[in-house]
Regions:
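Noncatalytic, basic helical substrate-engagement surface that gates or grips nucleic-acid strands
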Residues: 1-129, 133-155, 159, 233-236, ...
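Conserved RNase H-like, two-metal-ion catalytic cores of nucleic-acid enzymes
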Residues: 3-4, 8-53, 69-70, 74-81, ...
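Non-catalytic nucleic-acid-binding/docking modules located in mid-to-C-terminal regions
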Residues: 50-53, 98, 121, 140-144, ...
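Active-site-proximal helix-loop-helix substrate-binding element of RNase H-like nuclease domains
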Residues: 152-176, 183, 322-448, 472, ...
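Conserved "right-hand" nucleotidyltransferase catalytic core of DNA-directed polymerases
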Residues: 230-338, 347-356, 413-593, 609, ...
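Function-dense linear segments that define catalytic or interfacial modules
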Residues: 360, 366, 378-407, 411, ...
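Conserved catalytic core of nucleic-acid polymerases
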Residues: 453, 561, 565-566, 570-573, ...
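C-terminal polymerase-core module
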Residues: 472-479, 483-534, 702-750, 754-756, ...
């Protein structure tokens, strides 16, 4: 029998510390539960075990603590955020049918050793999944350790251990007894490190063998002294480090075969934890009808034909096969392609829908605007909980306990749809988010649908030629690198690149990882002056990314109409920003000359011009308004260059004396303040000492005193409420602020400072998009809104409409809100995006 045994504590710790803090909308921590399930699912998929045991440590002291008071004495307690997840995870595993095992007085390691030995005795094979290298001593021909590392899971068999350490698996106990283990506070022999311990065990076989050969010339005099003086510690360490194989637990492998568990309870718990994709991975059904059916029978409803003259309110949603249905009371109507478009703009009809954007696509394709749509449950769910990873009607119905009124085989989620939309509407009203939905998010969904439908024209031949030139450049750069290093190697292999730079060329290594030398961008940047090869490697990486991600990616996405139709996502960013995918048009490079050339291949259609409008320093203007800082407001009101004005104020010099370097420093501080950067990060950005950066920050905050006060208030209010808000009332939960982990808490504080500003900027550009789109239609123009990138809008307009469109963009973007500091938009035109911006 193939038995998989998980070291529960080791793996749950890796999950907790390896994944950013996640919470449900009601503040329950979930990252460890989420990560542990992914680890378990991946192990099951990769190894298909016959039985699975999950071993846990108990809180009670073990026999090792009794033998040595200092055992694990340096360990910190479990973080509160993880401790809260443990009982939930264990209950979920029980509901999923997994057998868990623990024993007071024994560690999970001993359970792993006991189960592996017992299974081997019956002729079985065992896989031990852990992140703890202590378990490597258990490896033999029948037992393999699946060692979880930061990047991958490494199968460790006897050959792998011999290759890595130069000893057999059981000899690792002997090594530890000499070198000790700081993580478990096992003392070892003071002054004997890993290298020496390995050498001694390789020569003498064991701890006992070392002490039997203390007079051997291979043992240096100082080493001999340490060994003689600390023999008792070494023998104690040997006992502490040896994993026992006789824990008093059930050892029959059959005992650990997975049971049926309680699928309904597991599905319900996963719904409460908002882990909908994992529900699907476990093969569970969490649809409201399925959950309800487990408790009581529901009346079965057969779909009907939509009335020829529909009126009143209907609730619309989409089945998994893409078909649409409507619910009115206890009636379900399947909507075909003939009836659906007319329903979306029908007079006397109000439609509450789940996911409006595809419906707006249909309406626009048929000459309508989806005027009957009055509410979108998906957008409401996003506004209520922007941290969720997915928004599906069936999953949300389970999450919000929206009970189904009936069952319908043709539309499994239909029975709970109206109840779900009711509860989402009520909760959004209670949160004060109704206006945000109706005036911004819902009309924006229509705008995004139109932008997706229209697309952006590109010069495909120009992109192909650009790709050819990049390939030629890459080949030349590659040959230069080979010549500089002296041989050919795989430049995309970090290991081979590290060997070339640090072993062959002799460059000073900056960082080392478990896999070898670090060759990340930061490391290479610090080595530029040592060899021309480094500069070429950085250039090679830049060109390769341009070619694979942008050139080849854009050509793949090109539609038959010669335009690229990106997908705009409204429910992804926690700050409220819109994102773009397939392809991501918001990430087209602009900071480098070569990267910005790509924008030159985004073109206006024949006879048309691109009109590009970009907000000027919108986030700083919001900062000046939101903080009420008179000095900052005055700088904007006077029309000054804000960065130059800031430099003049903090350096106490006339603006005319501000150099480019001083302006750059002021710009870094202006934006650094918003993003919560401290002296260390700012110093790194500016290439100055931490002390100098700290002086800059203090001077800045003295110059703009209300900025610092506002930032501190943001953090305090967020800690009190558990969330921050934009000026439009958009909420972002910040569970990170309650973390006991300093780094996580600091990250939460940075988000508390920045989100009200960045989120308000996102809201402003969204509202501007809605107003611009509507005004173009109201004035019956042929011009069309094509793209939004951060604070920039791009419109494609016929030549005779360009001046009118320029005026519309400027007016609507600048007048969308009325703040103490006016918003300004800079407008340009051109035949390409590069030229227009």
């Amino acid at each position: 029998m193939k038995l998989l045994v998980l070291d529960g504590n080791s793996l749950v710790n890796r999950a907790y510390f390896g994944i950013k803090l996640l919470t449900t909308k009601d503040g329950r921590y979930t990252n460890a539960i989420f990560g542990f399930q992914n680890i378990l699912l991946n192990l099951l998929s990769a190894h298909h075990p016959d039985a699975v045991a999950i071993a846990w440590d108990e809180k009670a002291p073990t026999f090792r603590h009794t033998a040595y008071d200092g055992y694990k004495a340096t360990r910190h307690g479990m973080p509160q955020e993880l401790a809260e997840q443990m009982p939930v995870l264990k209950q979920l595993l029980t509901d999923l049918g997994f057998v868990q095992v623990s024993k007071p007085g024994w560690e999970a390691d001993d359970i792993l050793g006991t189960l592996a030995a017992a299974n081997e005795a019956t002729g079985g094979t065992t896989l031990l999944a852990t992140g703890d290298r202590d378990s490597l001593q258990l490896v033999d021909d029948a037992t393999t350790v699946l060692l979880a590392t930061n990047r991958e899971t490494l199968p460790m068999d006897p050959a792998a251990i011999q290759e890595k350490y130069g000893v057999a698996p059981p000899q690792l106990i002997e090594v530890k007894s000499l070198m000790g283990d700081a993580s478990d506070n096992i003392p070892g022999v003071p002054g004997i490190g890993e290298k020496t311990a390995l050498a001694l065990v390789q020569k003498f076989g064991s701890l006992q063998g070392v002490y039997e050969h203390l007079d051997d010339k291979a043992i240096k005099p100082k080493q001999r002294e340490k060994l003689e003086a600390n023999r008792e510690l070494a023998e104690l360490s040997h006992m502490l480090g040896t994993i026992r194989k006789d824990a008093p637990i059930e050892t029959a492998p059959e005992h650990y075969c997975r049971t049926a568990g309680d699928p309904a309870a597991a599905a319900q718990l996963l719904a409460e934890l908002e882990m909908h994709k994992l529900t699907a991975r476990w093969g569970l059904d969490e649809s409201p009808a399925a959950v309800a059916a487990s408790a009581e029978a529901l009346p079965e409803v057969q779909p009907d034909l939509l009335p020829l003259a529909p009126e009143g309110r209907y609730d619309l949603a989409q089945n998994k096969d893409g078909s649409w249905y409507a619910v009115q009371g206890d009636s379900v109507y399947l909507l075909d392609n003939d009836r659906l478009p007319s329903l979306l703009d029908a007079a006397g009809v109000q439609l509450r829908v789940f996911d409006a954007k595809p419906l707006y696509h249909i309406a626009l394709e048929h000459g309508g605007v989806g005027a009957a749509i009055v509410f979108d449950g998906k957008l409401a769910a996003y506004l209520l909980n922007p941290s969720a990873s997915d928004y599906q009607a069936g999953q949300l119905a389970a999450e919000y306990a929206a009970a189904p009124a009936f069952a319908c085989a043709a539309a499994p989620d239909a029975g709970a749809l109206s109840a779900l939309l009711d509860v989402l509407s009520t909760k959004l009203d209670e949160q004060g988010g109704h206006d945000l939905l109706v005036t911004m998010e819902l009309p924006l969904a229509r705008v995004l649908a139109d932008m997706e439908r229209i697309g952006f024209a590109v010069d495909a031949e120009g992109i192909r030629q650009f790709g050819d030139s990049l390939r030629a450049e890459l080949n030349g750069i590659l040959q230069n690198i080979y010549a500089e290093v002296g041989y050919e190697f795989n430049l995309n292999s970090p290991k081979q690149l590290g060997e070339a730079l640090f072993d062959k060329l002799g460059l000073p290594p900056r960082k080392k990882t478990a896999r070898g030398y670090s060759t990340d961008a930061e490391t290479l940047e610090s080595l530029r002056t040592y060899s021309p090869a480094v500069d070429d490697i950085l250039k090679y990486r830049t060109y390769s990314k341009l070619l694979s991600t942008y050139v080849e990616g854009l050509l793949k996405a090109l539609g038959p109409d010669g335009r690229i139709h990106s997908t705009f996502i409204q429910t992804e960013a926690r700050t409220g920003r819109i994102s773009s995918t397939e392809p991501n048009l918001q990430n087209i490079p602009i900071r480098t000359e070569l990267g910005s050339r790509l924008r030159g291949y985004f073109v206006a259609a024949p006879g048309e011009t691109l009109v590009d409008a970009d907000y000027s320093q919108i986030e700083l203007r919001i900062l000046a308004h939101i903080t009420g800082d008179e000095a900052m407001q005055q700088a904007f009101l006077s029309g000054a260059d804000i960065h130059r004005a800031t430099a003049a104020k903090i350096y106490h010099i006339p603006e005319s004396d501000v150099t480019h370097e001083l302006r750059t420093s002021a710009k870094a501080i202006n934006f650094g303040i918003m993003y919560g950067k401290g002296a260390f990060s700012l110093g790194k950005d500016l290439g100055i000492s931490v002390k100098e950066a700290d002086t800059f920050l203090k001077t800045y905050l003295n110059t703009f005193p209300k900025v610092d006060g506002y930032m501190q208030n943001c953090i305090e209010h967020a800690k009190e409420k558990g969330y921050v808000e934009t000026l439009f009332g958009r909420r972002r939960p910040l569970p990170e602020l309650a973390s006991s982990n300093f780094q996580v808490r600091s990250s939460g504080e940075r988000m508390a400072r920045n989100t009200p500003i960045q989120g308000t900027a996102a809201d402003i550009i969204k509202l501007a998009m809605v107003h611009v789109w509507q005004r173009l239609r109201d004035e019956k123009l042929q011009a069309r809104l094509l793209l939004q990138v951060h604070d920039e809008l791009i419109v494609e307009a016929p030549e005779n409409e360009v001046e009118q469109v320029k005026r519309i963009l400027k007016e609507e973007m600048e007048q969308v809100v009325s703040y103490s500091v006016p918003l300004t938009a800079e407008v340009g035109t051109g035949k390409t995006w590069l030229e227009a911006h």
